């Protein structure tokens, strides 16, 4: 028996191995599939645009598994590649060993992005799928830096720093800020030098990124420098960069590190870049610019804040990133009553604010309540666009209730947003509590509308779930001028619907607070009638009524020209087009793509979109009784079995409950029959017989 089982197992695995070999061998190239590049045509082909190149060995198992994926990717993308001017190519490193040696290829397969000047970055996503490769191609084809030939021929502005030079910086002797990179080498005098980095595959691509950073920051009078950690082990180890001094784990890849040194300061002047490694320059540049600007606590005027809040933002632009989607944290004080100690809190905010993108710190010597009230009134001008409907009224009492504070305090304004926020600083205690202030800042730290992609969806879903119930995603496209213009209009409609919903949400909050007040007053009245002790009455009167600020919306837009496989990746089923809106319930990961009438959810009709928000979060205020039907993200079930989503959403406990119920239904009748038989049997055994119950007779004597 054991021998037969062993033979079966061996036969099974032999079949699997054969099938795998057959599958790999059967991967025939599609018609027109290009031959691998070689030393003769490599540079000529690179001169024609962007190239994603697979450096492979025909004897490498991983390369063999990648081969059919690469062919499918090329075939599906070949027409789009002509439009985007980016090509999928290959190099056989057995036939072109010298070429692979010149390109420092250390393992197979290695997938790299090249432009006419040479290597830009590596593709490091796993698993390597057709979808991830195509998404990478689309993303990189739209990055203007990748085709900037002037940049590639230019030199880096970064200065080589000896250990003594860096110590001078942190001693406060610099007059300009320095963004400094740290490298696992001792030989890099110029950051453009061609070097071999051990266990640092990302170092080569970051050299180009660092050049971009150095040139962009030079415009802002921010210096850049680089430190060789192998030459300065003590400094790097003290900074927590010990892995750049020597290899501690040969299997782990190392990454360059970056830190900012502020000038003319001997303390609180060194800040590590907080967001981890990236081959993109934007995050580093924003970090350096904002942190340096924030460290100066610049003044701002009411007029400047009003202009920023009233700004009409185009979230999509034909060139470059959106530059006016910022958040402004303003320290507001009365010059007649402020004391020098009140300003100390600003120094403690520099470091935590450096970790939040797009947030700027300012100060102003006046109360901004009137500005906040006036801006809030502008929101009602926007949402009262339909004269045929009942005009919505600004609830001044609710506004006052949510802006009670004393000076000094903090206000927060967002570009393009008429809604501002006031920190509840009722006393000096709150205004000197850095944790309380940062908790409040983080709660409102998302920009007005955020670009959603595969890298940040999960982060947005988990962001402040107690306050923000839903994430609304507008689908747009940035393929050309016409689409960009139309997409900006769609995002503005999304904003309009969200402001209408915000009015209803605030009115509902106000009603709930008044109900709690009435219940509290009724409770006080009752205990007074019962002639309760004075201390109990006082305790009841001191009970605080919580002002719950929940069921808010997070807004985002998804560029489907960049993220065509986004829906498949996250298991969001259905056919989608530009203009559609997807609402994700952040509490249970359900998504909704139909309105109250079963039609595709879009922002073309802001009122229907508003009603979708209301139906999900405040059904008692909804105009329509019909409920929205949602699906679970990454549900394993077909639409026909969507009722099973609730089981899958509860994970293992959900399936265990179903199994228990199934067993109960299956075994229930037989268990019940056995129970009846046993009960009947016990009843027969307890029969008294012809002599009667002897114990009873004894009791009768």
Swiss-Prot record:
Question: Per the database record, which ranges form the Thioredoxin domain?
Answer: 28-142, 408-446
The UniProt catalytic activity note for this protein reads: Catalyzes the rearrangement of -S-S- bonds in proteins
Give me the disulphide-bonded residues: 60-63, 200-203
Q: Which residues form the signal peptide?
A: 1-27
Residue positions the entry lists as glycosylated: 85, 264, 299, 370
Q: What is its EC number?
A: 5.3.4.1
The way it spans or sits in the membrane comes to: Single-pass membrane protein
Molecular function per GO: protein disulfide isomerase activity; protein-disulfide reductase (glutathione) activity; unfolded protein binding
> InterPro entries of this UniProt entry?
PDI, Thioredoxin-like_sf, Thioredoxin_CS, Thioredoxin_domain
**Into which EC class is this enzyme placed?**
isomerase
**What's in the misc comment field?**
Present with 6020 molecules/cell in log phase SD medium.
- This protein is called ER-retained PMA1-suppressing protein 1
